Amino acid sequence: MLEKAKIDRINELSKKKKAGTLTSAEKVEQDKLRKEYIKSFRTHMKGTIENTTIIDPNGKDVTPHKVKQLRKNKY
């Protein structure tokens, strides 16, 4: 995941934006940090989904076919 310092900076810039004191340089920095955060989030979420197996109450594997295919293509 993204470093805590970067997440803190995203939050700090967000507060400045709400207050109306965000400079154009900070706006560029905010956009860059947000894109980096979203990329990191998506990568981790994809990994979580690929490693999840869904079992129904009868014990049958009901993991969606698309997830199984992602898993196969990964290895």
Curated annotation (Swiss-Prot):
Keywords: Cytoplasm. GO terms for cellular component: cytoplasm. Its main location: cytoplasm. The keyword Transferase does not apply. Residues 56-75 are annotated as: Disordered. Residues 65-75 have a biased composition (Basic residues). It is found in: Cytoplasm. Belongs to the UPF0291 family. This is UPF0291 protein lmo1304. It comes from Listeria monocytogenes serovar 1/2a (strain ATCC BAA-679 / EGD-e).
